[in-house]
């Protein structure tokens, strides 16, 4: 069952002096430059910035997908880049729920198999009560045997959300989750993410170029030229 939490605040994520440089010498490109901030458990943070600002690079490093050139990423007090590749892959699968713009579903697996894949890769049994709760909230009960190509874009993104949630991750990271959807489906997906954030205290960090989405977050971090230009709480 998805845990409903409340009460005192606690730090779930800390980024310390994070930098990322691609290439070397005259061709070196600094994608991130000395970025530091922390996120509390249950916080909804929107990261915004123009194309090429470094926001997607930052998200990939928060999710353990791309190693920084320097600096630290601590998730629930674990410095994830002190882990070796095998340990990092396991940590990412168990503690980070990733949601992508283009869904990244396995085309030969049906809805149920895509959602439960992180558990099966870990050799864990599916908690039927939790699974049923997730698919009910996502309105996927009648789509469990469908393959991704039999679903609409909005339905595929719901599957992606279910997969991200199935392990009760410490953090959900969403990279432009509405970028491939029409306005109706975009609104529904954002409402679902907000519901999981508020009802179940699920920490949510979302990359978006859509100001309307960003303004629904608790906090907005603006990145430009690889640096934080603004970090403000818009609601508490």
Where are the predicted features?
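ABC family nucleotide-binding domain
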Residues: 11-223
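ABC-family P-loop ATPase nucleotide-binding domain
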Residues: 1-21, 229-236
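H-loop (His-switch) and adjacent beta-strand-loop-beta switch element
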Residues: 220-232
């Amino acid at each position: 069952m998805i845990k409903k939490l409340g009460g005192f605040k606690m730090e779930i994520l800390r980024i310390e002096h994070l930098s990322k440089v691609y290439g070397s010498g005259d061709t070196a490109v600094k994608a991130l430059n000395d970025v530091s901030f922390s996120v509390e458990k249950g916080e909804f943070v929107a990261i915004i910035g123009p194309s090429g600002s470094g926001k997607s690079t930052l998200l990939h490093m928060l999710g353990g997908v791309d190693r920084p050139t320097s600096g630290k990423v601590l998730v629930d007090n674990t410095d994830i880049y002190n882990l070796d590749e095998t340990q990092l892959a396991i940590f990412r699968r168990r503690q980070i729920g990733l949601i992508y713009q283009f869904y990244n579903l396995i085309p030969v697996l049906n809805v149920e198999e895509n959602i439960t894949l992180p558990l099966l890769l870990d050799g864990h049994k599916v908690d039927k009560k939790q699974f049923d709760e997730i698919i009910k909230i996502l309105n996927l009960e009648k789509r469990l045997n469908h393959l991704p190509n039999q679903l609409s874009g909005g339905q595929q993104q719901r599957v992606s959300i279910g997969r991200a949630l199935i392990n009760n991750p410490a953090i959900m990271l969403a990279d432009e989750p509405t970028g491939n959807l029409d306005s109706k489906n975009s609104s529904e997906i954002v409402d679902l993410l907000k519901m999981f954030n508020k009802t179940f205290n699920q920490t949510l960090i979302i990359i978006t170029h859509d100001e309307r989405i960003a303004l629904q977050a608790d906090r907005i971090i603006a990145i430009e030229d690889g640096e934080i230009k603004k970090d403000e709480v818009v609601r508490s």
